[in-house]
Amino acid sequence: MSGLMKAGLSSRRLPVSALFAGLLLSLSGTAAQAASAVITGKDGWLFPAWESLSKVDNAGTARSIALVKDVQQQLQRKQIALVVLVVPMKAPFYAQRLPADQPLNPAVVKRYDQLQGAMKTAGLTTLDIKPILQQTEHGKQTAFYRADYHWTAWSAENTADATAKLINERYRLQGEPGGGAVLGDWFDKRAFGDLASNFLPAIKRKAIGRDIYTVRHQVEKDLLIDDAPAPVHVIGNSFVQPYLGFTQKLSNALDRPVTLTWNPGDVGPWATLLQYLESPDFAQQKPQVIVWQFNEGQFHLGPDASANWNAKGVTSLSQWHQSIKKALP
């Protein structure tokens, strides 16, 4: 289900666990390491153990910011704007649900705000997603699924709304209104969260129980409308996949077509960006704005993080710079 697609086109429906399995197994290592891939908190809340609760890599973060800044400058020469979205880590939102023997390091708690400040200092256009997710938490709505790595569809849509507002404030999009995605009706589906289904033995998985996934039905759109040029393109991982609705909501809020390139998380943001920039789609129709999505917990990992990305997603820094220059001559 990776690759380029228009918001609003229906996609092959897979079980929640199948959608996320590639991301999780690759990030956590082999199946034999599955038991150590999950932190079991209070009230059945699960957290990914590959996102450290204690360590912060400031040097890696600074390097990633410099790489993103270089991409921004290369895109600017082509009159393409870049909006950077970094999804906050799950654990700081639910610190009270972490096990008592695995508390959050204060440095980890402060990291997201510091990252936002550093990106703005570097001149990057970014959206502070943390307050958006905090506002999402009310009543039965949560920012993240209880036993899942991912944010909820509510978080995805609220972030998409804020992203659309940012884009409309900064850029005058080409094309006529009326090309936005049509949103389907909400429905509930009970399923095991990916952290439970992929990493816990059956007896523990049963004890954790299923989560309720409130998501939208996919809506088939008029293909003539979908053929209109898209002024905005989204690049990211399974957080922006169609199942959770970010791109459809962004298209709906902008009232313009929005295209999407996404891969499972083990491919990494760097290779996914290159996949799009090297594609015939980009060569034939360049967007006005690229929205590039990262995750806080992996932001410090560069293109050369061979222990974290799959073989196709790893490249040396020198090769990365060469590839960017070739894709954006």
Task: Explain the meaning of each model-derived region.
Residues 17-28:
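Bacterial N-terminal signal peptides
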Residues 3-19:
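Bacterial N-terminal signal peptides that target proteins for export
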Residues 2, 31-329:
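Extracellular glycan-modifying ectodomains
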